[in-house]
């Protein structure tokens, strides 16, 4: 039977290093205020009728990592604060700007009129793979 240390060593690239997950206090993150003022990726996310609080929290966490502009929460999609959402958002619901809007279709139309290029993310007939997508860095996007 392998020890925990031996198991960890087997799953690292170098046998002399044990990888350890950093604590939030060790990440040297900027403050919420600094995050709000920081440059953002010209991308917004529109979530429509998402039931899973964990999925919503995960989108917040990803949005925080990529410093996206905003998340639009539409329809029955829950809004912060919520303890179940916080479990996966890990505080990103405080850093990422978000807005609740009832109607996703109107929101997408408004974003389009503001110059956003809109893409839908779905596994569907006729869709393209993400690695085949080419983005123009001079444009703003909504997904």
What are these regions (language model features)?
Residues 1-143:
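Post-transcriptional modification and biogenesis factors for structured RNAs
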